[in-house]
């Protein structure tokens, strides 16, 4: 069986800030946007979490929960540089590394001969190296399969690790709450519970067709996970499937025209990102996202052989109808990408949106 490690840095952005600015240590701290500019929390330390502050929470609400919260803007270039340090540490142990974000990654150490091939000891060594060289702590999950390693990395936080051996894998999976499986959000979990399914053991007692009937393709994935199966390989180089840009607004917008003005302001940045990261691919769809003042959101998309600003405007107009009187707090646009054929690559490689 494979030996998979999932490394997850502990409250990463906040930890970097506490490392670089010791005066923040021991105090509730969050990294995010300003509360007077409709900001959102990116991450927070454990002192802030004790007050109920969480990632993706509105900064203004976080300050209500924790009036003494220290709120600092993010320093993305610093976080990226430290993340690169961490990935260099990973590369000492394996070349099979799948970064999921700046602060987490999967590693396949099946062929690593260090520490007599013990994945447990390799995970300990990686975490030790990270702390010695960056001053930051990491947690780890070790398992023969990817999703269990990810779940396990959260069980002994912060600065710990949890091992699910091949012998204990099925026992661990059977007892696992379905809400712990990556991809199962609150709404999906509620639907599963309504079907009488709360744990993987429950899913093991029903036919796959029940899940696919209610959840489509994801139902088949869920069935596999609940039976302790996850054959996904480590993906070292992941092609981006979309490029997007969005902005949280200082004040809610209540007219379509105001939203269209914001959309127009996002186009130059989207073009810049497309030019930087979409080489060898072409646009095949455009997407507009709106988030409302109750934090619910909607997206609408359309196939686009000849993408244009006018199509974005049409999509936004359709999405705006769904506001039903609610204010708009965020506007986002994105372009879905697919690989070009050789013939297409010999022709124009222009990805900029036409006006």
Swiss-Prot record:
Its cofactor is Mg(2+). It catalyses: DNA(n) + a 2'-deoxyribonucleoside 5'-triphosphate = DNA(n+1) + diphosphate. Residues 4-185 form the UmuC domain. One of its GO terms (biological process) is error-prone translesion synthesis. Pfam families: IMS (PF00817), IMS_C (PF11799), IMS_HHH_1 (PF21999). It is found in: Cytoplasm. Its main location: cytoplasm. CDD domains: PolY_Pol_IV_kappa (cd03586). The active site is at 104. InterPro entries: DNA/RNA_pol_sf, DNA_pol_Y-fam_lit_finger_sf, DNA_pol_Y-fam_little_finger, DNA_polymerase-Y, DNApol_IV, IMS_HHH_1, Rev_trsase/Diguanyl_cyclase, UmuC. Its EC number is 2.7.7.7. Keywords: Cytoplasm, DNA damage, DNA repair, DNA replication, DNA-binding, DNA-directed DNA polymerase, Magnesium, Metal-binding, Mutator protein, Nucleotidyltransferase, Transferase. Binds 2 magnesium ions per subunit. It comes from the Bacteria. SUPFAM superfamilies: DNA/RNA polymerases, Lesion bypass DNA polymerase (Y-family), little finger domain. One of its GO terms (molecular function) is DNA-directed DNA polymerase activity. Mg(2+) binds at residues 8, 103. GO terms for cellular component: cytosol. Belongs to the DNA polymerase type-Y family. Monomer. NCBIfam families: PRK02406.1 (NF002677). Poorly processive, error-prone DNA polymerase involved in untargeted mutagenesis. Copies undamaged DNA at stalled replication forks, which arise in vivo from mismatched or misaligned primer ends. These misaligned primers can be extended by PolIV. Exhibits no 3'-5' exonuclease (proofreading) activity. May be involved in translesional synthesis, in conjunction with the beta clamp from PolIII. This is DNA polymerase IV. The gene is dinB.
């Amino acid at each position: 069986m494979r030996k998979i490690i999932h490394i997850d840095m502990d409250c990463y952005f906040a930890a970097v800030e506490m490392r670089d600015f010791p005066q923040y240590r021991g105090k509730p701290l969050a990294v995010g946007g300003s509360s007077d500019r409709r900001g959102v929390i990116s991450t927070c330390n454990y002192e802030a979490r004790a007050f109920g502050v969480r990632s993706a929470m509105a900064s203004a609400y976080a300050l209500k929960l924790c009036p003494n919260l220290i709120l600092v803007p993010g320093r993305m270039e610093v976080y990226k540089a430290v993340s690169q340090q961490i990935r260099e540490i990973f590369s000492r142990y394996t070349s099979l590394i799948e970064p999921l974000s700046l602060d987490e990654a999967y590693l396949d150490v099946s062929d690593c001969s260090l520490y007599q091939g013990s994945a447990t000891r390799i995970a300990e060594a990686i975490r030790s190296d990270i702390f010695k060289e960056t001053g930051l702590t990491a947690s780890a999950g070790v398992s023969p399969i990817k999703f269990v390693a990810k779940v396990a990395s959260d069980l002994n936080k912060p600065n710990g690790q949890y091992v699910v051996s091949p012998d204990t894998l099925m026992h661990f999976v059977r007892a696992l709450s379905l809400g712990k499986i990556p991809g199962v959000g609150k709404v999906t979990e509620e639907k599963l519970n309504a079907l009488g399914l709360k744990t993987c053991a429950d899913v093991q007692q029903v036919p796959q067709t029940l899940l696919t009937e209610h959840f489509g393709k994801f139902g088949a994935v869920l069935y596999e996970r609940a039976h302790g199966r996850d054959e996904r390989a480590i993906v070292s180089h992941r092609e981006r499937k979309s490029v997007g840009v969005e902005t949280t607004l200082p004040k809610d917008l209540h007219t379509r025209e105001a939203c269209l003005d914001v959309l127009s302001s996002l186009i130059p940045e989207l073009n810049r990102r497309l030019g930087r990261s979409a080489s060898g691919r072409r646009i095949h769809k455009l997407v507009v996202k709106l988030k409302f003042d109750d934090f619910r959101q909607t997206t609408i998309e359309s196939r686009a052989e000849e993408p244009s600003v006018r199509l974005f405007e049409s999509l936004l107009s359709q999405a705006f109808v769904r506001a039903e009187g609610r204010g708009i707090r965020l506007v986002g646009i994105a372009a879905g990408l697919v690989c070009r054929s050789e013939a297409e690559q010999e022709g124009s490689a222009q990805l900029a949106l036409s006006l």
